[in-house]
C-alpha cells in the first residue's frame, strides 16, 4: 500500500542518550524547525547506560515508520549497536557527540575519558543554578515581598510582559530573580523602594501587541476576548501607570514587543554588566 502524503511527511526522531539527552533534543528541535510542513514526533530514551537497555530501545523503535536516530553515547561499545541497527534498517543515524570529541582529540593529542555525564558534574555552579531556579519559582508574581530584597534582579511589568519566562531564563544564568505584576491603583510593596534601582527592570510593551496577546490568551481559554483585560483603553492606562512608576524609581526600562526572551535577557545582562553569568 502506498504511503499517504501525511505519512510521507511524518518523521519519528529517536533520541538515545546515556545522560538526560537535552543536547541531542535541542539539536533535533533546531533542525526540525527548518521543516515546518513535516509532522515531527520526538521519542526520547535517556539514561541508556548498558547494552540490555539499548537492546530494548532498538527493539521498541523498530515498529515506528520513517525513523531518524540521533544519539549521544560516550562509550564506543554503546555506539556500535546503534550504528549496526541503522545500517541494517536503512535508517538515517546521527552521532552528535563523537565528531566533537574526535576533533578535540586530534587537536590536543589527548585521550578522552569516556565518562558519562561529565558535562553535568555536580559542582558549586550547578547547585547555585538549582537554587536560583527555586528562588524564581518561590518569588514569582510577588508572592513574598521579602524576595525583592534578596534578589539579584527584580522584574516589574503589567500582565503579559514575559515576567515569569524571563525570571526562569535568568535563573538558568545563576541569577536570583523576583518579579511583581503591576495593576493600576494597587499597592506597591515598600520593599521595591528599598532596593538599588539598578537591580530593577521595568518591562513594557506596545499597546497593540499587548492587546493581541491578551485576546489570544482569552480565546485559548475559551473565553470572550473582548473584556476589560484586552480593552485598549485599559491597556493604555496600565502602561501609563507602569511607566510613571518606572520614572519614579529611576529604573531601566525595556520594551519587550517583538523581542524574544533571549534578546530581552541579553539586554538585562548587559545592563547589569554581566557577559555570561552561567560560565
Curated annotation (Swiss-Prot):
The alphabetical list of record keywords is:
Kinase, Nucleotide-binding, Serine/threonine-protein kinase, Transferase
UniProt cross-references to SUPFAM superfamilies, sorted A to Z: P-loop containing nucleoside triphosphate hydrolases
Q: Does the keyword Transferase apply?
A: yes
Looking at the Swiss-Prot or TrEMBL record, what is one Pfam family this protein matches? Kinase-PPPase
Tell me the GO molecular function terms: ADP binding; ATP binding; phosphotransferase activity, phosphate group as acceptor; protein serine/threonine kinase activity
**Record-linked InterPro entries:** Kinase-pyrophosphorylase, P-loop_NTPase, PPDK_reg
This enzyme catalyses: N(tele)-phospho-L-histidyl/L-threonyl-[pyruvate, phosphate dikinase] + ADP = N(tele)-phospho-L-histidyl/O-phospho-L-threonyl-[pyruvate, phosphate dikinase] + AMP + H(+); N(tele)-phospho-L-histidyl/O-phospho-L-threonyl-[pyruvate, phosphate dikinase] + phosphate + H(+) = N(tele)-phospho-L-histidyl/L-threonyl-[pyruvate, phosphate dikinase] + diphosphate
Q: List the disulfide bonds.
A: none
What EC number(s) are associated with this protein in UniProt? 2.7.11.32, 2.7.4.27
Residues the entry annotates as binding ADP: 157-164
Entry-linked PANTHER family: PYRUVATE, PHOSPHATE DIKINASE REGULATORY PROTEIN 1, CHLOROPLASTIC
Family, per the entry?
Belongs to the pyruvate, phosphate/water dikinase regulatory protein family. PDRP subfamily.
Its annotated function is as follows:
Bifunctional serine/threonine kinase and phosphorylase involved in the regulation of the pyruvate, phosphate dikinase (PPDK) by catalyzing its phosphorylation/dephosphorylation.
Name the record gives this protein: Putative pyruvate, phosphate dikinase regulatory protein
Taxonomy of the source species? Bacteria, Bacillati, Bacillota, Bacilli, Lactobacillales
Amino acid at each position: 500500500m502506498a504511503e499517504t502524503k501525511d505519512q510521507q511527511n511524518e518523521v519519528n526522531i529517536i533520541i538515545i542518550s546515556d545522560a538526560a539527552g537535552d543536547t541531542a533534543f535541542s539539536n533535533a528541535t533546531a533542525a526540525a524547525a527548518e521543516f515546518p510542513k513535516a509532522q515531527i514526533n520526538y521519542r526520547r530514551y535517556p539514561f541508556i547506560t548498558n547494552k540490555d537497555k539499548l537492546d530494548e530501545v532498538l527493539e521498541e523503535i523498530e515498529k515506528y515508520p520513517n525513523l531518524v536516530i540521533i544519539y549521544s553515547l560516550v562509550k564506543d561499545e554503546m555506539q556500535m549497536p546503534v550504528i549496526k541497527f541503522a545500517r541494517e534498517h536503512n535508517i538515517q543515524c546521527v552521532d552528535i557527540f563523537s565528531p566533537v570529541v574526535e576533533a578535540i582529540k586530534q587537536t590536543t593529542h589527548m585521550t578522552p575519558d569516556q565518562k558519562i555525564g561529565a558535562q553535568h558534574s555536580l559542582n558549586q555552579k550547578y547547585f547555585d543554578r538549582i537554587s536560583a531556579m527555586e528562588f524564581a519559582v518561590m518569588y514569582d508574581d510577588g508572592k513574598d515581598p521579602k524576595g525583592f530584597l534578596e534578589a539579584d534582579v527584580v522584574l516589574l511589568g503589567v500582565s503579559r510582559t514575559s515576567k515569569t519566562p524571563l525570571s526562569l531564563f535568568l535563573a538558568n544564568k545563576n541569577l536570583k530573580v523576583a518579579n511583581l505584576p503591576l495593576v493600576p491603583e494597587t499597592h506597591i510593596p515598600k520593599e521595591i523602594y528599598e532596593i538599588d534601582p539598578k537591580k530593577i527592570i521595568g518591562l513594557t510593551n506596545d499597546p497593540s501587541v499587548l492587546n493581541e496577546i491578551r485576546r489570544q490568551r482569552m480565546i485559548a481559554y475559551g473565553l470572550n476576548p473582548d473584556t476589560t483585560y484586552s480593552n485598549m483603553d485599559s491597556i493604555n492606562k496600565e502602561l501609563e501607570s507602569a511607566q510613571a512608576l518606572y520614572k519614579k524609581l529611576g529604573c531601566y526600562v525595556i520594551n519587550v514587543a517583538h523581542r524574544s526572551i533571549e534578546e530581552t535577557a541579553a539586554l538585562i545582562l548587559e545592563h547589569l554588566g554581566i557577559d555570561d553569568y552561567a560560565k
